Regions:
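A short helix-breaking turn/cap at a secondary-structure junction
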Residues: 1-58, 228-239
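Glycine-rich, small-residue loops and helix-cap segments
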Residues: 4, 66, 122-239
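Predominant activation on well-ordered alpha-helical scaffold segments within soluble catalytic domains
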Residues: 4-8, 29, 61, 92, ...
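Glycine-rich beta-alpha junction loops
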Residues: 10, 45-48, 79-83, 156-158
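Acyltransferase
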Residues: 27-30, 52-78, 96-105, 127-148
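Short helix-loop capping/hinge segments that flank enzyme active sites or metal/cofactor-binding pockets
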Residues: 33-44, 85-142, 192-205
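Short glycine/threonine-rich loop-to-helix capping motif typified by GTGT followed
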Residues: 54-56, 83-93, 162-168
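Catalytic beta-strand/loop signature of glycosyltransferases that borders the donor
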Residues: 76-81, 187
Length: 239
């Protein structure tokens, strides 16, 4: 519900923002209470379910059983996978003004700075090839949504890293973002909701994704799942 309230305040066309979409803004808060019994669910097992931690696999299967009860059908689907990434280029372009000035560049956390700088030397031809590839993938994902209304995937294949494991950030970041970054390429709305814990008490999430401008359906199923479970209300003891 918090995410719906936030998006309700943020959404809308802004002529000063080239990435802004000229489209009507739905009532996202009312969408939380939309019926989900007619939704067709697609489960993207290829790639997204590969190499899952055992606890994540078990918790995800339980979540899928609950989602099956909340919706009309659940079926496996294949998603197109982008073979190139433009992610390093666009963040660098956004931050370039600040990265070029020593006084503002020094404000960046070293690991963040290192990631941003990977986009500095990518040739324009490589970037254009990547953009064309993403256009192809985005068109293909549209055909998937002719068969299903929403997609389900695990949020991460691995449990949260320990402080020690976090000392090797490239590996940790790549693993933690493996299941989320493709949806950046698809350009579709996606939300992660808590669906359980590992045997050691570490949180596990499941992703719900919808078609372009399909936030209302995403909110509806996420809210229905949270009403059917209690994971989102559980908090660690701070004592």
């Amino acid at each position: 519900a918090d995410t719906a309230l936030m998006l309700q305040a943020l959404a809308g066309y802004d002529p000063g923002d080239l990435a802004s979409i000229r489209a009507d803004v739905p009532d996202y808060v009312s969408a939380l209470y939309r019926r989900t019994s007619e939704f067709r669910i697609g489960v993207a097992r290829s790639f997204f379910f590969e190499g899952l931690d055992e606890d994540i696999e078990e918790v995800t299967d339980r979540a899928l059983a609950i989602l099956s009860d909340l919706t009309a059908t659940v079926q496996d689907v294949e998603l197109p996978m982008p073979t190139v990434r433009v992610v390093p280029v666009e963040p660098y372009a956004y931050h370039a003004e600040y990265l070029e000035q020593q006084e503002t560049r020094a404000l960046y956390q070293p690991r963040v700075l290192s990631r941003l700088l990977t986009g500095a030397d990518i040739p324009a031809t490589t970037y254009l090839e990547a953009r064309n590839e993403l256009t192809r993938v985005q068109r293909e994902i549209e055909t998937v949504f002719s068969e299903v209304d929403l997609l389900i995937t695990p949020t991460s294949p691995l449990l949260p890293a320990t402080i020690e494991e976090g000392q090797n950030p490239p590996d940790v970041i790549a693993s933690s973002l493996r299941n989320t970054s493709p949806f950046d390429a698809y350009g579709i709305p996606t939300i992660s909701v808590p669906c359980g814990f590992s045997q050691d008490g570490l949180p596990i999430g499941i992703q719900i994704s919808g078609p372009h401008l399909g936030e209302s359906a995403v909110f509806a199923l996420a809210h229905a799942y949270e009403q059917a479970t209690d994971w989102h209300n559980q908090q660690p003891s701070l004592a």
